[in-house]
Amino acid sequence: MPTLEERYLAAKQHLFRKVYGARLNPPQCDAVFQTEGPLLVLAGAGSGKTTVLVRRTAFLIRYGNAYHAPAPSGVREEEVGILETAAEMPPEQIEREILPLFIDHPCPPWAILAITFTNTAAKEIRERLLAELGDEEVASQIVAGTFHSVCVRFLRRYADRIGFDPSFTIYDTDDKKRVLTAILKDLNISDKILPPKTVANAISAAKDKLQGPESITDASSPRARDIRRVFEAYQKKLQACNALDFDDIIMKTVELLESCPEALAYYQNKFRYVLVDEYQDTNPAQFRLTELLSGGSRNIMVVGDDDQSIYAFRGATVKNILSFDKAYPDCRVIKLEQNYRSTKCILAAANAVISHNSDRHDKKLWCDAGEGEKIHLRETEDQNAEARAVIDTITAQMVLKHRHYRDFAVLYRVNEMARAFETAFAKSGIPHRILGGQRFYDRKEIRDMVAYLYIIMNPADNLRLLRVINEPRRGIGDKSLDAVAEIATAEALSMYEVMAHANRYTALARVAPKLVEFTDMMNEIRTAVEGGELTPSSLIERLFIRTGYRDMLTAGGEAEKPRIDAVEEFITGASEYESRAETPTLAGFMEEVALVSDVDKYDAEADSVVLMTIHSAKGLEFPVVFLPGMEEGIFPGAQSIGSEAEMAEERRLAYVAITRAKEELYILHTRERMLYGRTNANPLSRFVKTEIPESLLDIADPPRSFAPPRAGGYMHGGYGQGYRTPTPRPDGTPAPRRQESELYRRVEPPKPQKNAATFGVVRFAPGTRVRHATFGTGTVRSARDMGGDILYEVAFDSGMTKKLMATYAKLQKI
């Protein structure tokens, strides 16, 4: 027979479940109530993970550890009886009158850290917490932000402990490339042999693992030695410019916490609870960061789905979520498998595909929604017919199903597929947006304005200084700038400091007035900022005018008006930041600008069709989704085939793509596709042909006169290479063919696939010694047929390994 204490605890927990169970399913309730210790929530696609994050955070603030707290000492039978009777009350009354009696160590809002991967996710959490708590002051005190934005706050506070000034600036991908290009030139290393992007990737990969230049230790490889030299020079350049790149932001924060006991103690004591969203996308540095931050209380909750880990190319490792229970042996694991987004048919297809991955947490999505429509599988002649088929379907659904344009999304595997769709949509007049095209902040005029702002904030930023010193033209030549750089290096000063005192240096005598005029102008504006006279928006406006940038654009006439409009929109963005920030500062605005992403700019209410890569679509959902290019060599990609790890990632990407669809999913492929300047006849993707059950597919028959022969079947290689000639008229002329929808438009029988010999490509066996015009001599590791070409993997003597298409590589046997 249960004791009074056990009855009390059971009655209390029953009351909590009655209240929260009205809005959450049982596993979601489990996650909300599990407040203490490590917690891994495996949240399948569309399973309500954000709801759980928000409700759990609100629960911590309202009730603390109320659900699991033991019965008070000396509890009486009457008290237990009251609780057991209270179960008959309506949930609203229980929440209002009974639950507050159980509050146990509620958590102050500022002691909760919620880390996300996008600003949009952080904003949604804050907004939903406000709605849940009903108290703006409380909701605003929760620290919610991206990994980078949270770490920037930490670094500003303790920058001096790691050798930086708090006014440090942040270098983005383009800035990083510019610095590396200059370093390669200084070191006399050809950017053809060692491209800046290759070095950038190597540096990022090292920093993601919390490693520096010393980690590149292959002394026998000239390429590795060069990368290390560039890496070392790059870090020195960043230090001299008081700048950090994106990877440094995480790495330097870990360095701070590991080397500064004061900082570690401060943040471990400050944050009683650490919550991490999208944990499957974390890299080793982020794993270590969250481990350090939660090391005091060990109250860490991570939410994610290993089946949606799709960012290995950015350094993410699925191992973090797969081995979380090994890193935290006492953790509790809760699975959210009920989907609130898609139909049964769509989920069945997603489950079928992902089940072919072996190294994963076992889970299976299910839903209470209906079966829904089968997945529509369509074949078209080529990429242009594919795009027109999508447009025809959208046009028909707008009429027949009264949809909005925003209900549709076209998700493609690679950006290069966007061209055919962009052309077709432009001709059709259908409103559309391409997410992932040129970002607003990548426009030249915006990058120039951002550079001016960074110079105001951090005069030591030589990279930004060189970008705008002649924007607009000021008559300061390259030789003069080289002289400034030499003096700065010799005297351990920033280039800005040398320019400000140019009159002291005879080498700068001729150009000194222009240099001093520039720095005097910038110093005057900086003084106004420091004196509180200029907000970020008014600062941009003053820089736009005082620097002469506006006059330069105005002189360009009507052609430059869009650039003026862009800067004015930038000013508007700064004004919006000022209205929502509690304490608007230039540093705060610059952090927001530096850390914005494409998805953060996505507007779900804009009534237009969205075109984007599958990677960009993660976290989004649409009533109708089109997946073009579901073909071998594209999805999965050619270079992933043959690698178990890369194929597993491609399959996870397919799972993500399928689960973006709420109501209808269209999968498209072509008989021939031109991509990267070549035309290939790619087979239907294995993800569809062999992994999705045929019973889930609606396979459209081509028009009757072009029907494929029954033998073989569509899903088993019978693609229909014959057609029946229309019955002739009595006068002997052919009968007219009936007009067909573009979705099922007539296609010619597929042409025999060309083999490598047709193109005059010579096959080299593995082990063959070859020469390449740029990369030098090397040894063929493997050769794979690729739709009429050969994909070679060659290990070059320089130490690099390249995958090259034979047609373009023009390898010579030696």
Where are these regions (language model features)?
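Conserved helicase NTPase motor core
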Residues: Q13-A45, T50-L53, P72-E84, R96-E97, ...
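Conserved helicase C-terminal RecA-like lobe
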Residues: I216, S220, H404, A418-I430, ...
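Helicase P-loop NTPase motor core
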Residues: T50-L53, L83-P106, P329-R332, Q338-P431, ...
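Conserved beta-strand -> loop -> alpha-helix junction used to position metal-binding or nucleic-acid-contacting
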Residues: A139-R153, D172, I430-A451
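Conserved P-loop NTPase-based nucleic-acid remodeling module centered on helicase motor cores
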Residues: P109-A202, E214-D218, R378
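C-terminal accessory regions
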Residues: T554, G629-K803, Y808-I814
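Short glycine-/polar-rich loops that comprise or flank the Walker A/P-loop
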Residues: G37, C107-A111, V138-Q141, G296-N299, ...
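Post-Walker A helix-loop "phosphate-sensing" segment adjacent to the P-loop in P-loop NTPases
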Residues: L60-A69, C107, G134
